[in-house]
């Protein structure tokens, strides 16, 4: 950000010189400072009369017109009439004046003082300008009138921009301003700045002049001049001025180290300065080497990215610079390095933030699917997009449409404008020597994709929907891509849930059912569980899974997955934690620094921890890595002890001799104020009381199984003075023992449950389950991997810790109270359930997953075709050894890799059985 503020200071200094471009905003610069204009809507809500509206804005979000999602048919076709007044600064006398629109949906007709300013513009997402020099009054108020037709008179624009899978709006949704330039001015510049300082630039001026030259001066972030290049005379045939030279001692731009410079371009006629413009540039080289890879500054890349719409729930497509900063920071927090502009060029400030904070960008010409823009209007829009965005170092690819919305006649225009000759992609197709195929299944391809000879980089993959996709399956996909030399990475679909606040529906958050609920974050950027899964998997410093033993020497093998950064640029710390109760404030910790290892990009090495003596007595180890900017890459957590060790330390051991009673139907065990009732016929828990108060835990442990089993016997006995009840279940024919469990009442009142079962082969779930009424629950304190729930193909991203969770009935993507309460929690150690009579339960075995109630099913989507609804046990509290994976919007879970498959459990001996132990403290 230091680069950005230095640029603003420099720009302000130049504007004072008098030969620059002066700017006066007629609107706000974004949704956070919008200005009111007069407005008349021709149809829908609040139509038929003049009112006020904020500019910029989408008029539907301001209470006017009719909402439409892109799939709606037919669509509303109202128009908006705008009026405002403005004055022209006296200092602009003698200059040429233009009115500039950064974006207007869709056909836009401009009048100044009753006279039309040029031809109407068609196309929503593109900056356009019209000269109004002869239409304005210099010494009195001017009237601006704008008519915006939501539906274009050009059918191809409606097909490309409005028959689509996103919200479609109407209105002047980006800023409007006046520009004043000298009579002879620089129209735009096209700069190619390479990694070693080579610089080539084309300067385009508004009209041919004689004796014209240009100069580029390069200044660093300290505003020090580091080099200048002077042009040859203007090329009379092309009307452009070309410069070529080399700037020494530059630092190349990359997403890891986004070094920016200020380019000051001055147009001269002999010794007279005609016009000066500035731009921020970065020196970097992008190469696509066919059948090899994509290289940035000579280094082969794998892009870790996401698709992003320009969207905010209360303002639609109208955003602001702070929102762009926040979004890029969120992407970088997930350790992403790339973003695709789906499916249109974004706000200018978003690209500027990508330049400043460091993101690789695919900038896209709109066309959601077939048909695309026609060639006539498409030619205009390509020019408008590239003239605005050419010099952004963050942009490494152009995209001509999406998923079949390709007008191939427009492809040659991109290199005509772009001296960098960046590849032009056709997202979902093979183009620019890159296969951008969408939504590929794991390890798929015959002669292509994972099994081809072309570079492949899916520009959409692992389609999110509700709580599915994104991080689910990513671990397997990413490992496979890392092993494939032709993989250039991937871009997830998509960044944020596209919900709009419908004031016409009492503030309902509308995602158009399942169409817009695709995000890694919610409409207000609420983080879903996949956010942290992605963060761990895409961390550029990678720590593998590791099981700590008492004799461990404190050394981790780690991998540096940065492209340019040595591992010693990062900071490393550890923390040891000892759990003394299920309360955060009782955690006992000790922490320390770890020496930063010297590991070059792409190589492996070792991280050596110097742990204090007695570290083995702690329960968990946390290792945190922060980048050179002190931003956390990830914190990994590791088990030191076992759940059984922790449970025995936390639970009371003393008490009174347990009592036993028997009736015709039940056994009753009691000790230390706790009484439990078991069914004589099946051994299942029937009721619990503690201190005379009922705890409605019952009907368990039921084996989670599709097997037809029967209870063969329930046996009572005493072991060391403690009553036990042993239940044995067999297959219906009685030949094979399938399941046994043993209840033991301890003197402390702790009820111990030991169980052993033979799992079936090829199952989604395995474990035991109990009933407990959901209406009793206020929350829970978990000692487990959290705070988000997991699926079998989305285990990463959490942390072993104490998590205090309030009850909610969140439906991911329909309500956004995160983290969700219900679901699966891995590495379960213990839990205190907050209910009228709270109780605790602890695991005595590793690798148990808690099923904490069953999430509600989405209300807005047909469950028969929803691959993001997973299976849960019939009970509400379950202790699992196998849980299901979750799918994506377009695919069932089994399509997405090894972790997404049903669980295999083939084996013949008792060693293949699964055993577990639970301690209940009622």
Please report, for each region that a protein language model flagged, where it lies by residue:
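Accessory carbohydrate-binding/adhesion or oligomerization-edge regions at the termini
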Residues: 18-70, 147, 151, 156, ...
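Accessory beta-strand-rich segments of carbohydrate-active enzymes
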Residues: 20, 31, 40-44, 72, ...
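An acidic-aromatic loop/edge-strand motif
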Residues: 21, 58-62, 66, 70, ...
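Substrate-binding clefts and catalytic carboxylate motifs of secreted carbohydrate-active enzymes
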Residues: 29-48, 77, 104, 167-171, ...
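Active-site-adjacent substrate/metal-binding segments within catalytic domains
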Residues: 61-88, 92-112, 118-121, 179, ...
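Beta-strand/loop-rich accessory regions of lumenal/periplasmic or secreted enzymes
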Residues: 103, 150, 254, 614-616, ...
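Beta-strand-rich binding/interaction modules
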Residues: 112, 198-233, 239-241, 554-593, ...
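Substrate-binding/catalytic cleft of secreted carbohydrate-active enzymes
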Residues: 328-331, 338-529, 533
């Amino acid at each position: 950000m230091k680069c950005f503020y230095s640029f603003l200071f420099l720009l302000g200094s130049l504007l004072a010189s008098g030969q620059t471009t002066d700017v006066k905003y007629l609107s706000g610069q974004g949704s956070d400072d919008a200005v009111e204009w007069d407005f008349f809507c021709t149809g829908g809500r609040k139509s038929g009369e003049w009112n006020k509206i904020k500019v910029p804005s989408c008029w539907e979000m301001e209470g006017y017109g009719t909402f439409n999602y892109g799939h709606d048919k037919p669509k509303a076709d109202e128009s908006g009439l705008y009026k405002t007044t403005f004055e022209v600064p006296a200092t602009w006398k003698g200059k040429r004046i233009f009115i500039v629109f950064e974006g207007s949906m869709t056909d836009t007709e401009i009048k100044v003082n009753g006279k039309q300013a040029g031809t109407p513009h068609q196309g929503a997402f593109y900056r356009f300008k019209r000269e109004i020099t002869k239409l304005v009054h210099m010494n009195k108020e001017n009237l601006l009138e704008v008519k915006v037709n939501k539906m274009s008179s050009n059918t191809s624009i409606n097909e490309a921009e409005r028959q689509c899978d996103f919200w479609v709006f109407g209105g002047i949704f980006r800023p409007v301003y006046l520009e004043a330039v000298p009579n002879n001015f620089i129209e735009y510049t096209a700069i190619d700045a390479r990694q070693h300082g080579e610089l080539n630039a084309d300067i385009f001026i508004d009209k041919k002049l004689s004796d014209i030259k240009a100069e580029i001066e390069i200044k660093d972030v300290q505003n020090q001049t580091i080099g200048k290049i002077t042009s040859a005379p203007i090329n009379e045939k092309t009307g452009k001025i070309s410069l070529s030279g080399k700037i020494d001692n530059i630092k190349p731009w990359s997403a890891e180290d986004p070094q920016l410079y200020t380019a000051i371009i001055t147009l001269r006629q002999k010794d007279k300065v005609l016009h000066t413009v500035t731009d921020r540039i970065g020196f970097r080289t992008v190469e696509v080497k066919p059948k090899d890879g994509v290289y940035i500054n000579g280094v082969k890349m794998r892009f870790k990215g996401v698709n992003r719409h320009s969207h905010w729930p209360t303002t639609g497509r109208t955003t602001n610079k702070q929102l762009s900063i926040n979004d890029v920071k969120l992407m970088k927090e997930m350790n992403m390095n790339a973003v695709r502009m789906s499916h249109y060029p974004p706000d200018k400030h978003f690209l500027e933030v990508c330049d400043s904070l460091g993101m690789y960008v695919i900038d896209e010409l709109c066309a959601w699917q077939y048909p695309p823009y026609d060639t006539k209007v498409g030619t205009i829009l390509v020019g408008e997009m590239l003239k605005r965005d050419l010099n952004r170092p963050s942009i490494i690819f152009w995209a001509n449409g999406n998923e079949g919305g390709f007008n191939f006649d427009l492809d040659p225009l991109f290199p005509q404008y772009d001296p960098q000759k960046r590849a032009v992609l056709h997202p979902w197709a093979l183009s620019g020597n890159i296969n951008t195929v969408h939504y590929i299944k794991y390890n798929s391809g015959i002669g292509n994709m994972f099994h081809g000879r072309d570079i492949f980089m899916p520009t959409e993959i692992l389609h999110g929907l509700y709580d599915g996709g994104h991080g689910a399956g990513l671990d397997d996909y990413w490992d496979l891509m890392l092993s494939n030399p032709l993989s250039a990475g991937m871009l997830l679909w998509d960044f944020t849930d596209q919900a709009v606040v419908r004031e016409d529906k009492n503030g309902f958050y509308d995602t158009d059912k399942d169409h817009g609920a695709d995000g890694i974050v919610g409409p207000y950027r609420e983080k879903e569980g996949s956010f942290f899964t992605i963060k761990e998997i895409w961390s550029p410093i990678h720590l593998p899974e590791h099981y700590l033993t008492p004799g461990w020497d404190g050394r981790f093998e780690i991998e540096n997955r940065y492209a340019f950064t040595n591992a010693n640029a990062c900071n490393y710390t550890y923390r040891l934690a000892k759990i003394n109760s299920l309360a955060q404030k009782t955690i006992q910790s000790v922490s320390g620094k770890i020496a930063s290892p010297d590991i070059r990009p792409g190589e492996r090495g070792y991280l050596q921890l110097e742990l204090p003596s007695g570290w083995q007595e702690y329960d968990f180890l946390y290792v945190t890595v922060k980048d050179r900017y002190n931003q956390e890459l990830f914190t990994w957590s590791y088990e030191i002890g076992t759940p059984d060790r922790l449970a025995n330390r936390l639970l009371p051991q003393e008490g009174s001799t347990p009592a036993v009673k028997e009736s015709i139907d039940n056994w009753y065990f009691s000790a230390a104020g706790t009484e439990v009732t078991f069914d004589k016929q099946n051994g299942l828990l029937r009721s619990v009381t503690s201190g005379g108060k009922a705890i409605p835990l019952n009907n368990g442990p039921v084996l989670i199984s599709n097997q037809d089993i029967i209870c063969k016997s329930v046996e009572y006995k005493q072991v060391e003075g403690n009553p036990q009840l042993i239940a044995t279940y067999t297959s219906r024919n009685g030949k094979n023992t399938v399941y046994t469990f043993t209840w033991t009442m301890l003197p402390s009142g702790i009820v111990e449950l030991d169980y052993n079962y033979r799992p079936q082969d090829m199952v989604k779930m395995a474990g035991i389950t109990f009933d407990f009424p959901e209406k009793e629950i206020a929350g829970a304190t978990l000692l487990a991997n959290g705070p988000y729930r997991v699926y079998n193909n989305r285990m990463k991203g959490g942390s072993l810790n104490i998590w205090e969770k309030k009850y909610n009935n969140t439906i991911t993507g329909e309500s956004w109270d995160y983290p969700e309460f219900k679901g699966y929690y891995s590495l379960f150690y213990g839990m205190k359930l907050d209910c009228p009579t709270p109780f605790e339960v602890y695991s005595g075995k590793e690798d148990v997953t808690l099923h904490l109630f069953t999430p509600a099913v989405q209300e807005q989507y047909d469950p028969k075709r929803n691959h993001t609804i997973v299976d849960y046990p019939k009970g509400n509290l379950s202790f699992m050894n196998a849980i299901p994976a979750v799918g994506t919007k377009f695919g069932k879970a089994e399509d997405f890799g090894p972790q997404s498959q049903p669980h295999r459990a083939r084996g013949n001996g008792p060693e293949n059985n699964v055993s577990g132990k639970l301690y209940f403290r009622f």
